[in-house]
């Protein structure tokens, strides 16, 4: 999980979602998981 000021899709399978008011990226590739912080 990377915590970044701005989250972006890295590949085609990345999805940008909102969970508990936080913007997150979920993906099949665990290295692409990101959270805005």
From Swiss-Prot:
Residues in the signal sequence: none
Domain of life according to the entry: Bacteria
Gene Ontology BP, a term: translation
Pfam families: Ribosomal_L36 (PF00444)
Keyword Ribosomal protein among UniProt keywords: yes
Keywords: Ribonucleoprotein, Ribosomal protein
MF (Gene Ontology): structural constituent of ribosome
UniProt keyword annotation of Ribosomal protein present: yes
GO cellular component: cytoplasm; ribonucleoprotein complex; ribosome
InterPro entries per record: Ribosomal_bL36 (IPR000473), Ribosomal_bL36_sp (IPR035977)
Record-stated family: Belongs to the bacterial ribosomal protein bL36 family.
Name by which UniProt lists this protein: Large ribosomal subunit protein bL36
Provenance organism: Cutibacterium acnes (strain DSM 16379 / KPA171202) (Propionibacterium acnes)
Gene: rpmJ
């Amino acid at each position: 999980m990377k915590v970044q000021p701005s989250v972006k899709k890295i590949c085609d399978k990345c999805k940008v979602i909102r969970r508990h008011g936080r913007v997150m990226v979920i993906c099949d590739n665990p290295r692409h998981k990101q959270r805005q912080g």
